[in-house]
């Protein structure tokens, strides 16, 4: 079923978006198949009136018009629609308007005549209406009003799939009722005045099959104008629900079908001989249907008939002989309850499927027929005029359905849901659904509503509780079972932990192809042979990657081309390096790679925009390495790589073995790739860092820590990391922390040297250290750095 979101919100309007509303509807069991706008995207289209309309002097099929759009002057517009005429209210696209497809309206000349706008058809506005010519608006449409506002076109058509047991939702009222329940909102009740009988005409009813039709209502309405146009609001509501406007009588019955879910039918009173019979077909009877086809009736088919023969297939299809046409003056409205078993399968016997049969065979609210008749009468008198007779009803209380009363045990509810819901909450859910309910001795006794044919057994009530309570609100408890767990080393480092750390550092994970452009790869790794695919997807994807960097740089370029200047990406995956000694002649190595470019931090009013540098990426990598067992043994050793800037590149070494690289992409390569700004990358073997420190708990020292600061002068070539490592090694167990807090070059330091300011924290777990003991540690450190690096204390 397709319905208008705006129409439903007239009944109940929760404070949720369209997307959230669709999610709610789906979780209620009414699966949303699709959502589409009811009109195209356009602006600048207003209600106008054709004040003058004359033939174009140089074109037989064009007309020259003057249109009033509420401005200070009339607009000259050339129109080719055959229905364009004086006095017509139209949809006028004024200068500057933009129609679907980004079609812009400008002043122009057509065959020498000025045209300052465009009179639009439905199709030109992206509105799905089968109509020739331009839109004809009601004569009372206010001139100058925005068409989107006038027709309420900011709306969506939502299509849902219903299971056969939920026929109660085959209407706007039913869907609104469900939305109101889940949002704990009352549904706006439709208020209309029942039309009193103003004439004494009645219709005699001969109910011969009460078991198949326990309730049948007819009403005469005389002197109707079937040529009156259906109001635009009704046509629009029908259109958005997928029903085409035909004439006011048919439109009204279709409107009631959609609004209440009650199928109705209208007969031409002049073509019906009373009494109207409700009976089963007789052998040999035939009926010419409204579509012109002839049905050879079978004896199990319920009919509406008169003394002259069949008038309609009950609850399925009307007959042509009694149908309403343009000459009809008096009509008989029909509203009935047909038993589902009397209709089910009958339409398919004749190759038919109608909106009426679709509802009746699933079940229609048996209390709805009179309300639907009153509503249809009110609409008919409002639109077509006329005089209404009394509502004539024939019914059989014996054969009318009975509302089911079902009991629900607390133990059964808990066992089936695997979750305990408070008693008050369950009772409230039943009340919100419109059910009568009592609770005693851990049992709910529930009486369903007339519109809920599907509530028959205990499990039906459990389903109602679950879907209204919310399937997502029921904990997803895994079943208990005995499992054989695999061995897991405590020292194994989970890759997900590393990914989380990078995401926390404002990186995003990327997944790029293992196939790369050989030209780009040779630019980055000119001395590395690559595997070439014999049958590649394309020339640009014909080589296996020897590094993840080429793919990440492509991702950076992709983002920069889309106005993303700050890019921080990481990727994990295999690189494929040809190796005669490896299995199958290729070494597959799992690596972690990352790339950064742009500013170091996101734009912020309180922060200064600084570009990333080598140490930003190095710091992020060191943070990752701090999670690993060997992170403190990793060294960054200056080394040149083909793809990297010779002055900003280093090899990553663990215990003297190279496990990766880090640095800035070479400027010439950045230029050839089209990258903007400096780009920094690293790549490291995962297996080399895939172990973590196993936590060893120890008591925190309660004795004071002593800090000593040293300013050591060393040669420029001495790495600070090696100096710090030497300090830690020489200081022994009492030296608990070493930190580099300043680097200085300038006055007081000889050229070619630098001053490294280092803090040493000395502490013992068993006693307060004396000055002599502290000085001994400091002396050992000074002696070690003197011997290894010829370090001197700065004056």
Curated annotation (Swiss-Prot):
Ranges of residues in domain tRNA-binding: 39-148
Cofactor note: Binds 2 magnesium ions per tetramer.
Protein species of origin: Haemophilus influenzae (strain ATCC 51907 / DSM 11121 / KW20 / Rd)
Catalytic activity as recorded in UniProt: tRNA(Phe) + L-phenylalanine + ATP = L-phenylalanyl-tRNA(Phe) + AMP + diphosphate + H(+)
Class of this enzyme: ligase
Protein family (similarity comment): Belongs to the phenylalanyl-tRNA synthetase beta subunit family. Type 1 subfamily.
Stored HAMAP family: Phe_tRNA_synth_beta1 (MF_00283)
NCBIfam families: pheT_bact, YtpR
The B5 domain, residue ranges: 401-476
Localization annotation: Cytoplasm
The protein's name: Phenylalanine--tRNA ligase beta subunit
Keyword Iron-sulfur assigned: no
Superkingdom of origin organism: Bacteria
EC number(s) reported in the record: 6.1.1.20
Subunit structure: Tetramer of two alpha and two beta subunits.
Cellular component annotations (GO), alphabetically ordered: phenylalanine-tRNA ligase complex
């Amino acid at each position: 079923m397709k319905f208008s979101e705006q129409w439903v919100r007239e009944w109940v309007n929760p404070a949720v978006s369209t997307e959230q509303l669709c999610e709610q509807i789906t979780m209620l069991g009414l699966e949303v198949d699709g959502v589409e706008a009811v009109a195209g995207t356009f602006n600048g289209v207003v209600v106008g009136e054709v004040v003058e309309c004359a033939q174009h002097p140089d074109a037989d099929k064009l007309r020259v018009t003057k249109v009033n759009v509420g401005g200070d002057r009339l607009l000259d517009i050339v129109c080719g629609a055959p229905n364009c005429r004086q006095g017509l209210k139209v949809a006028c696209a004024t200068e500057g308007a933009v129609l679907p497809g980004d079609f812009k309206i400008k002043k122009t000349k057509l065959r020498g005549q000025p045209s300052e706008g465009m009179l639009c058809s439905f199709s030109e506005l992206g509105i799905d209406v089968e109509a020739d010519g331009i839109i004809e608006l009601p004569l009372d449409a206010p001139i100058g009003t925005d068409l989107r506002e006038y027709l309420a076109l900011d709306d969506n058509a939502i299509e849902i799939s219903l299971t056969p047991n939920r026929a109660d939702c085959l209407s706007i009222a039913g869907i609104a009722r469900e939305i109101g329940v889940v949002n704990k909102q009352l549904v706006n009740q439709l208020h209309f005045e029942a039309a009193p009988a103003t004439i004494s005409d009645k219709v005699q009813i001969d109910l011969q099959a009460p078991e198949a039709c326990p309730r049948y209502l007819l009403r005469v309405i005389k002197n109707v104008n079937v040529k009156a146009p259906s109001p635009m609001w009704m046509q629009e509501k029908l259109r958005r629900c997928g029903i085409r406007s035909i004439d006011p009588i048919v439109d009204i019955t279709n409107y009631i079908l959609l609004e209440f879910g009650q199928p109705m039918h209208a007969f031409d009173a002049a073509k019906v001989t009373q009494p109207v019979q409700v009976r089963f077909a007789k052998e040999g009877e035939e009926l010419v249907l409204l579509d012109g086809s002839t049905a050879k009736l079978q004896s199990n088919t319920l009919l509406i008939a008169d003394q002259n023969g069949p008038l309609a297939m009950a609850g399925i299809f009307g007959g042509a002989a009694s149908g309403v046409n343009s000459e009809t003056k008096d009509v008989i409205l029909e509203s009935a309850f047909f038993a589902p078993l009397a209709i089910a399968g009958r339409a398919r016997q004749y190759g038919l499927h109608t909106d009426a049969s679709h509802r009746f065979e699933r079940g229609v609210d048996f209390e709805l027929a009179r309300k639907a008749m009153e509503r249809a009468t009110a609409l008919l008198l409002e639109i077509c005029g006329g005089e209404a007779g009394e509502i004539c009803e024939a019914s059989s209380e014996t054969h009318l359905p009975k509302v089911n009363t079902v009991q629900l045990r607390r133990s059964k509810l808990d066992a089936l849901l695997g979750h305990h819901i408070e008693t008050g909450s369950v009772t409230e859910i039943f009340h919100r659904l419109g059910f009568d309910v009592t609770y005693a001795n851990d049992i709910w006794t529930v009486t369903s509503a007339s519109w809920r044919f599907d509530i028959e057994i205990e499990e039906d009530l459990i389903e109602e509780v679950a879907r209204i309570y919310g399937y997502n609100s029921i904990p997803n408890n895994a079943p208990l079972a005995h499992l054989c767990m695999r061995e897991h080393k405590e020292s194994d480092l989970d890759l997900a932990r590393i990914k989380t750390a990078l995401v926390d550092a404002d990186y995003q994970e990327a997944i790029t192809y293992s196939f790369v452009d050989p030209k780009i790869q040779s630019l980055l790794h000119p001395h590395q042979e690559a595997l070439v695919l014999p049958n590649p997807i394309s020339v640009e994807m014909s080589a296996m990657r020897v590094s993840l960097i080429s793919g990440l740089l492509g991702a950076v370029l992709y983002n920069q081309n889309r106005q993303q200047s700050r890019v921080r990406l990481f990727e994990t995956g295999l690189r494929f390096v040809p190796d005669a000694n490896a299995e199958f002649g290729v070494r597959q190595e799992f690596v972690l790679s990352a790339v950064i470019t742009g500013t170091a931090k996101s734009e912020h009013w309180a922060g200064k925009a600084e570009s990333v540098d080598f140490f930003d990426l190095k710091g992020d990598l060191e943070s990752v390495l701090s999670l690993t067992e060997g992170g403190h043994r990793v060294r960054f050793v200056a080394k040149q790589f083909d793809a990297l800037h010779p002055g900003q590149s280093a090899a990553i070494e663990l215990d003297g073995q190279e496990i990766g690289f880090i640095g800035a992409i070479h400027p010439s390569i950045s230029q050839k790739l089209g990258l903007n700004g400096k780009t920094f990358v690293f790549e490291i073997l995962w297996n080399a860092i895939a172990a973590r420190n196993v936590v060893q708990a120890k008591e925190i020292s309660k004795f004071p820590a002593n800090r000593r600061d040293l300013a050591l002068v060393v040669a420029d070539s001495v790495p600070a990391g090696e100096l710090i490592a030497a300090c830690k090694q020489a200081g022994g167990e009492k030296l608990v922390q070493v930190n580099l807090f300043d680097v200085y070059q300038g006055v007081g330091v000889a050229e070619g040297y630098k001053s490294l300011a280092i803090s040493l924290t000395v502490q013992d777990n068993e006693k307060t250290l004396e000055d002599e003991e502290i000085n001994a540690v400091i002396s050992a450190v000074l002696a070690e750095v003197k011997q290894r690096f010829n370090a001197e204390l700065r004056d």
